[in-house]
Amino acid sequence: MKAILLVLLCAFAATNADTLCIGYHANNSTDTVDTVLEKNVTVTHSVNLLEDSHNGKLCRLGGIAPLQLGKCNIAGXXLGNPECDLLLTVSSWSYIVETSNSDNGTCYPGDFIDYEELREQLSSVSSFEKFEIFPKTSSWPNHETTRGVTAACPYAGASSFYRNLLWLVKKENSYPKLSKSYVNNKGKEVLVLWGVHHPPTSTDQQSLYQNADAYVSVGSSKYDRRFTPEIAARPKVRGQAGRMNYYWTLLEPGDTITFEATGNLVAPRYAFALNRGSESGIITSDAPVHDCDTKCQTPHGAINSSLPFQNIHPVTIGECPKYVKSTKLRMVTGLRNIPSIQSRGLFGAIAGFIEGGWTGLIDGWYGYHHQNGQGSGYAADQKSTQNAIDGITNKVNSVIEKMNTQFTVVGKEFNNLERRIKNLNKKVDDGFLDVWTYNAEMLVLLENERTLDFHDSNVKNLYEKARSQLRNNAKEIGNGCFEFYHKCDDACMESVRNGTYDYPKYSEESKLNREEIDGVKLESMMVYQILAIYSTVASSLVLLVSLGAISFWMCSNGSLQCRICI
């Protein structure tokens, strides 16, 4: 009975002890992050670094609408294909959009020489001034300028021709040598386009140009070529057995370009003074053009985001996040989110940083929970919380600032003969993309690991701060909590929290209570030892008596024979 009373006394004393726990904030967040060592760690707060949404629209970029080519492509727009007349009035754009069915390019069959390079040049052009480089009515008085039409380039059901070129043919059975020059006085680069016709037969050559041995010569300070017609039978394309090759050059300011020909020249009528724009580009997209504005455009749609990474499309125009292959890039800013199981008791399961966080701690990341004669409650440690918030905020901002270099990324242009180069370029681009993706993911993993370790360290420092003040005036109960050996009212609790705890003031009371509790424990232990010895002896005697009784019974009924030899 005495032992039972002593045990109850110990339990009663422990229950009434004032207690202080160090712990951290928890909430109902379901955000998860990855670290170097763990995946899907639930945290209280995090920020997303990866944009994965767009609006599915083509929008104005910098307040300027895109040039939607519709069924036309760059070749058709630059040469003036009759099917592209709606584009003739457009002089500025933020970017150029081709669609998957932009097939109206060169209507008269032939090769567009260095077409991919022209596309590359135009991808950085945001506007142009279209002007008549050689006026139709006055530049070619000795040559016919109205007969150069073809059924391959129809308009309104009749034969027509490119709007920006003039197909010169003989006039009154004569094609005199022509020589025409233009001096670039626009103060900017001028795009000049022309063509050379290759008839299928000598009869067609004479019928169109009179001269059998015709040539075309084009020269400037940086361009000098001489062309001769290649007369040969060819299969018909778009009803034409002849071919027409198309050429272009960029004329620098102050430079002169001269055209000389005795036949077969498809002369330039209009040229383009170009204005470069760093954010321009050419994309292929079937998305519709809408009345909207954006800073970043992709073929799938516009992105309005300040995040450093996106996984929507590798081709972008404007101030765009860097494309990566990742599906998740989330950086932790809070703590591990492990809410305590309240049903296990106030100090059983919400035992600070060991077993879980506190949803009741709402005004800080780290703090205290106390229980004394005046009640119980939570109190955040504002200083350590603010220092942590400032440090993590600066780190996140630094990461975003370093990685948030805005990009315009457009596809490179290769013709069909450059497939090996194109494939090699794709492999190189894929390699760079893999490196970017790896760097981004590893950066986030490392920073997440460091942040969570940082929080653990802050909680531990808070615990050590309390332990160094309390010393032997309180007992560590192994779960982030201290059990006081003295009465600790709210003022006392506050002094522990703010670092002004008066150890000598409570040391004498703590010493007496500690000795009393230790004495009770010692006496209780002695009683337990006596009870244990008594129990052992008693159980041994019972066992011996039982064995003797069984043996006597077995001997009396003959089941067991006992012989005593002397």
UniProtKB/Swiss-Prot annotation:
Disulfide bonds join C21-C481, C59-C292, C72-C84, C107-C153, C296-C320, C488-C492. The chain crosses the membrane at residues 530-550. The record marks R344, G345 as: Cleavage. It holds the Pfam family Hemagglutinin. Residues 551-566 are cytoplasmic. A lipid is attached at C555, C562, C565 (S-palmitoyl cysteine). Palmitoylated. In natural infection, inactive HA is matured into HA1 and HA2 outside the cell by one or more trypsin-like, arginine-specific endoprotease secreted by the bronchial epithelial cells. One identified protease that may be involved in this process is secreted in lungs by club cells. It is found in: Virion membrane; Host apical cell membrane. It is a single-pass type I membrane protein. Residues 1-17 form the signal peptide. Its main location: virion. The keyword Magnesium does not apply. GO terms for cellular component: host cell plasma membrane; membrane; viral envelope; virion membrane. Glycans are attached at N27, N28, N40, N104, N304, N498. Residues 18-529 are extracellular. Binds to sialic acid-containing receptors on the cell surface, bringing about the attachment of the virus particle to the cell. This attachment induces virion internalization either through clathrin-dependent endocytosis or through clathrin- and caveolin-independent pathway. Plays a major role in the determination of host range restriction and virulence. Class I viral fusion protein. Responsible for penetration of the virus into the cell cytoplasm by mediating the fusion of the membrane of the endocytosed virus particle with the endosomal membrane. Belongs to the influenza viruses hemagglutinin family. Homotrimer of disulfide-linked HA1-HA2. Interacts with human CACNA1C. Major glycoprotein, comprises over 80% of the envelope proteins present in virus particle. The extent of infection into host organism is determined by HA. Influenza viruses bud from the apical surface of polarized epithelial cells (e.g. bronchial epithelial cells) into lumen of lungs and are therefore usually pneumotropic. The reason is that HA is cleaved by tryptase clara which is restricted to lungs. However, HAs of H5 and H7 pantropic avian viruses subtypes can be cleaved by furin and subtilisin-type enzymes, allowing the virus to grow in other organs than lungs. This is Hemagglutinin. It comes from Influenza A virus (strain A/Swine/Iowa/15/1930 H1N1).
